[in-house]
Amino acid sequence: MTLFEPIRLGDIHLNNRIVMAPMTRSRAGQNDEPTQLTVDYYAQRASAGLIITEGVYPSYDGKGYVRTPGIVSAEQIAAWEKVCHKVHENDGKIVMQIMHCGRIAAAANKPDSARTLAPSTIHAAGKMYTDTDGMVEHDVPLEMTLEDIEQTINDYATAAQKAINIGFDGVELHATSGYLPAQFLSTGTN
């Protein structure tokens, strides 16, 4: 067995055993949509056995960082579909990583109606870059209600279904590195 031999991952046939890990690049367009630069970036890497996208927020509440892509609006969905098409055209496979930042967020990076939600109102240490204000402290999150939790679960499911519907070969849930799922599992944040 070598790195360059094909392998099956469930129902997905990979041309080799190389997996490109997710890397947040903060290059989304003005409406958090993948741009032509994004299409080209992933297409150039399609020879990897599998590409895992940068973290993609499932709802505006889930956005944390500046210029990161979502899969919420019709514009975002259409742009991700172009990415999928180009990767598949180049004989690649691609999985979307869905990432809800939870308390690792700054209001300046979100639409006005979006909230910073977490299991508890525990402020995250550190700062985050914003285009409008430079480096700012993370928001103090709102404690999620049961309704917020149910909505967030639905947001994940909806985002995953949208990804599959437009051609992604699968989805990965980012559940580590201090983001929302990990916040629920840690006594330091819940």
What are the residue ranges of the model-derived segments?
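Hydrophobic faces of well-ordered beta-strands that scaffold small-molecule active sites
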Residues: 5, 18-21, 51-53, 94-98, ...
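Conserved, mostly hydrophobic/aromatic
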Residues: 20, 45, 87, 96, ...
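Catalytic domains of carbohydrate-active enzymes, especially glycoside hydrolases
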Residues: 38-58, 165-170
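Polysaccharide-binding and catalytic clefts of secreted carbohydrate-active enzymes
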Residues: 140-144, 172-190
